[in-house]
Amino acid sequence: MVDFAFELRKVQDTGKLVMGAKKSIHYAKVGGAKMIIVAKNARPDIKEDIYYYAKLSGIPVYEFEGTSVELGTLLGRPHTVSALAVIDPGESRILALAGGKE
């Protein structure tokens, strides 16, 4: 089983990710993301856009079971993070969470 927190930190250290709903929606629209992670309590309109555009682009979406505050804390940020896009997973196995290609 893949440990989300561990793999997310690994992406931060060895790969590339972008934080924020607007940027995540952008990457869902144009492609370029390997995976998008959205917090369980993200606004419904944000979740709807992310799921819609990610489906069109063939990008897997993982819904984080915690809140945007908890997601921000996992990333070491002093603010909420409702969504993020994984551009390069680096050495992590985070793509396995959403059934993406590792």
From Swiss-Prot:
InterPro entries for the chain: Ribosomal_eL30 (IPR000231), Ribosomal_eL30-like (IPR039109), Ribosomal_eL30-like_sf (IPR029064), Ribosomal_eL30_CS (IPR022991), Ribosomal_eL8/eL30/eS12/Gad45 (IPR004038)
A GO MF label: RNA binding
Entry-linked SUPFAM superfamilies: L30e-like
Biological processes, Gene Ontology terms: translation
Keywords: Ribonucleoprotein, Ribosomal protein
A GO CC term assigned to this protein in UniProt: cytosolic large ribosomal subunit
Gene3D superfamilies: 3.30.1330.30
Family the UniProt entry places it in: Belongs to the eukaryotic ribosomal protein eL30 family.
PANTHER family: RIBOSOMAL PROTEIN L30
Designated name of the protein: Large ribosomal subunit protein eL30
Record organism: Thermococcus gammatolerans (strain DSM 15229 / JCM 11827 / EJ3)
Encoding gene per record: rpl30e
